Amino acid sequence: MARVKPFKGLRPPRELVEQVESRPYDVLDSDEARAEAGNNEKSLYHIIKPEIDFPVGTSEYDARVYERAAENFAKFQREGWLVQDADDHYYVYAQTMNGHTQYGIVVGAAVDDYLNGVILKHELTRRDKEEDRMKHVRVCDANIEPVFLAYPDDDVLDAVVARYTLQEPEYDFIAPVDGFRHQFWIIDKEEDITAVTERFALMPHLYIADGHHRTAAAALVGAEKAKANPAHTGTEEYNYLMAVCFPASQLTILDYNRVVKDINGHSPAEFLALLEKDFVVSPQGTEPYRPARLHEFSLYLKGEWYSLMLKPGLVDETDPIESLDVSISSKRILDEILGIKDLRSDKRIDFVGGLRGLSELKRRVDSGEMQMALALYPVSMQQIIRIADSGNIMPPKATWFEPKLRSGLVVHKLS
């Protein structure tokens, strides 16, 4: 069973939300954060990317940077830019992209559920990235940014959400950069709060969609605090991490594509011939071509697009990892033909998230920076759940969720 609880959110006043809110810390670099914050002292980037308060070139891992995060977090509360709710609430957070809206419930999710395998992951985490986020959680004594979870669709939760979204939202704005709409409501009726808690308690698992390092860091700091507290009861706020939970069917996963600097010494004709061992190769002309189904790939090479359709019978469709298109392309194209063994470390390959589209693949090849591009059919939420349920891990660079959660709509204090 999944254990969730309401919490007293720390939030910007309605009239300040668009000055406070930001993109997540891990989707932009320090220079971009500095530019987006500009002269806005209320921008959450001063808490989640506090290196922007220091001279250009200051490491984001400098001890002074973490200290500044804590100082700025205290300042935001002192100045009234973040104000704590008087009562425990759940919250509804809706995101609208290209006419599609997904409705999440903001909860405190039990740290123990992550440590004990109720909250399931599908990606490996890196210890250095975990430690960075742990330092941030420790100095702020808060989950400044939420993690992004998925849950099996539930009619009762849908009904609760629907009742609130008929009302005027607490926040309603179009975000800069992505241009998507973000709305936020407060679940404040006792019977609805009880219903949310009880419905989640019936779910055997929740699934991390995005934010594996934030989840691990929040859970590990929570466990640290529990161990260090001789009066620990299990009800303290540090036993919970802030998460936005969405019905799995509502989530949008975009293609996560590859661009490669060279084709390993092969001529284009040789490369295409090697592909024909495992794929039916079909020329598609000069207009961008998007894969239309599972096991179909799109190749851009020397100004031409090709469809690569995996030949039948080559993969075990019952194997949740082997049957993934990211696994097929990694093994049968990137490794066996191009000699790229490790996607994380090989400098010959780069990755292009789906929002930037096929035009970005074409641009990077046409510029001469890269020699070829490979577009994949998006992973489905069902595939992610199947892998998480089986205890497996997705290959690197497999999922690109969109839209990303905005940060700064609500913060969860740990004490």
Question: Where in the sequence are the language-model features?
Answer:
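Surface-exposed, charge/polar-rich loops and edge strands
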Residues: 1-415
